[in-house]
Amino acid sequence: MTQDELKQLVGQAAADYVIANVPEGTIIGVGTGSTANCFIDALAAHKARFRGAVSSSVATTARLQSHGIPVFDLNDIESLPVYVDGADEIDHGGAMIKGGGGALTREKIVASVAEKFLCIADASKVVDVLGQFPLPVEVVPMARTAIGRRVTALGGVPIVRVTKDGAPFLTDNGNEIIDVKGLRITDPRTLEAHVNAWPGVVTVGLFAARGADLCLLGTQKGVETIVYPNR
């Protein structure tokens, strides 16, 4: 199977999981990206079972609404039974790098409210040590250079994310992103807390303090379910 086919496979598996494990009439959290889009597309056939969704980005909101799935503001929701999202990398303990699509802050906010984080990914995203995928850091624009110096001091290579026309990429929150290359992240929880404490950082794309509870992993043999018991 191609990578796109694996994404569709786990997207359908996630929809099946939600249907089987989440009570009817509830609201679910939905992430951002190509794998999350496959989940949205698979969930659309069963949208009548749920009140709707909380979205992690403008793009996801548009995708949900295109299927007629109601989108709720997180401020109006007390809790979410599950948050479903992909990952750029995931280690064997359920810690992830996320933010390749630029929605890391809203993804982290929605995930923090959910009772369960269901990660959906293909097998290529599983790593022994996080860091081969550049680590996104969302920053307030005026802090970009200062944060870049801190990243360099850690041994990373900071690269400001730009659009196709060379302008700084802006998140849905109006901030910029520094993608950090060259890190070998052996202690993701500690690094997450450390970088998040820097003035000017909105959030870092490490999801370790609130990592995945389980992962539906697309492989050439089918979907593998991985549970992270220490979460």
Curated annotation (Swiss-Prot):
It catalyses: aldehydo-D-ribose 5-phosphate = D-ribulose 5-phosphate. Its EC number is 5.3.1.6. Keywords: Isomerase. Substrate binds at T32, G33, S34, T35, D85, G86, A87, D88, K98, G99, G100, G101, K125. Pfam families: Rib_5-P_isom_A (PF06026). GO terms for molecular function: ribose-5-phosphate isomerase activity. One of its GO terms (cellular component) is cytosol. CDD domains: RPI_A. The keyword Isomerase applies. The active site is at E107 (proton acceptor). It comes from the Bacteria. Pathway: Carbohydrate degradation; pentose phosphate pathway; D-ribose 5-phosphate from D-ribulose 5-phosphate (non-oxidative stage): step 1/1. Homodimer. Belongs to the ribose 5-phosphate isomerase family. Catalyzes the reversible conversion of ribose-5-phosphate to ribulose 5-phosphate. This is Ribose-5-phosphate isomerase A. It comes from Paraburkholderia phymatum (strain DSM 17167 / CIP 108236 / LMG 21445 / STM815) (Burkholderia phymatum). The gene is rpiA.
